[in-house]
Structures are given as C-alpha cells and as structure tokens.
C-alpha cells in the first residue's frame, strides 16, 4: 500500500532535501520509519500545460509509481515533480525515468 503525503512538515522537509532529475521528471526523497508504508506526492505545475494535460501527466506518474511500488522504500517520502517536457513524454519515457530515479534513491 502507498500512502499520500498530507502533512505540511513532510512537505517542508522534502523541499529542503536534495532534488534529482531524470528526463522529464524530478524526485525528492526523504527516508523515514520502515514500519510505515511509503508516502508519495506529485507536483505538476501550470508550466506543464492546461489542466487536462496536467491531470494526464499526474495519472501517468501515479501509474508509473504503481508499476514500481516494489522499489519504494518502506516509510520513505517521495515527491515527484513534472517539468514542461513531461507533457509530451510517453508513458514509457515517464516510467523509465521513474525507474532510474528510484534506483538512484535506493543507492543513497
């Protein structure tokens, strides 16, 4: 199971953490309590496009997260951000970029 990030303290900690970018998406990672499930949030700004495009990108990011859920560290908090290039990226490109980002987080 994957939880949503809802508390302000976690968002503040994530924004002060180091950001990694691979292709059209970026990821900020914060280790946490391994007894809890991983927590995920998505940031898709207006620079990506109109609401229809932003929602499509967000749905694709959620689907890619579910495809890689075994790679998420228990208790960790992840913030995935989408840049303007994400609007024209295919699901396969977003999925590959997320896989690379999660592999980098695994090594740290």
State each model region's role.
Residues 1-108:
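Positively charged, solvent-exposed patches that mediate nucleic-acid binding
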């Amino acid at each position: 199971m994957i939880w949503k990030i809802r508390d302000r303290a976690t968002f503040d900690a994530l924004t002060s953490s180091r950001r990694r970018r691979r292709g059209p998406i970026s990821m900020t990672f914060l280790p946490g309590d391994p007894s809890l499930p991983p927590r995920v949030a998505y940031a898709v700004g207006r620079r990506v496009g109109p609401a229809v495009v932003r929602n499509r990108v967000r749905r694709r990011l959620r689907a890619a997260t579910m495809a890689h859920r075994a790679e998420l560290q228990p208790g960790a908090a992840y913030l995935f951000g989408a840049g303007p290039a994400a609007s024209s990226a295919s699901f396969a490109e977003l999925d590959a970029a997320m896989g690379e980002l999660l592999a980098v987080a695994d090594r740290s």
